[in-house]
Amino acid sequence: MMVPTTGTRGEICCAIADRIPAQESLAQAAAGFLGQSRIEMGYRRFTLDCSGLALGVYATQGIDLYSGLGKLDGGNGVGRIFTHVVQHGRIHYGPTVHPGDLVFFHNTWDFNRDGFPNDPLTHVGVVEKVEVDGTVVFVSWVSAGIERYRMNLQEPDQHKTGDGRVLNDFMRRKWPGDPQATRYLTGQLFAAFGTLISR
């Protein structure tokens, strides 16, 4: 399922929405996984990847992000989670973002292995907070482990400010031979936010 990648580029985004305890709990759960080498909730262990982290975070609130989906609904794990949000929550592009929101990305790696950046819904993270300049801080898993990442949709093409503050982390690895149109920063690869808990 394809969603726009440019809907908020350069617009006034993002601000944190009014805090709701259940959403705060999701954000705190995501932060609690930082640096962990396993994603576990009770007796359940999740795969050590971005989808597994999202599943584990939401499991802390009794939410199964694969609930109601057939085995192939949505394709990969990220696509399945996106489909769940479409069915049970709200896909949006800001300008307000909730703690615990899911944040989806396109083209973070060559999923279909054809050498082109044409891979929808390849990564997901969980929003922890929004900084005063609108930079979204989210928790996700990449090859280095479970870490915090930043994304600024007002400056999607800028990695750092002049004083060294990170606005957009690198989310796609650079490879020799990448097509000229390949993008690498979080703000460039942003697909959408997803809200499941609204009260």
State where each predicted segment sits.
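...with weaker cross-activation on analogous glycine-rich loops/strands in unrelated enzymes
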Residues: 66-148
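Short, surface-exposed, charged/polar-biased interaction segments
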Residues: 50-51, 74-75, 79, 159
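A short macromolecule-binding patch
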Residues: 148-155
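Low-complexity, Gly/Ser/Thr/Pro-rich intrinsically disordered linker/tail segments
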Residues: 157-199
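Functionally constrained cores in energy, signaling, and assembly domains
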Residues: 58-61, 128, 148, 177-178
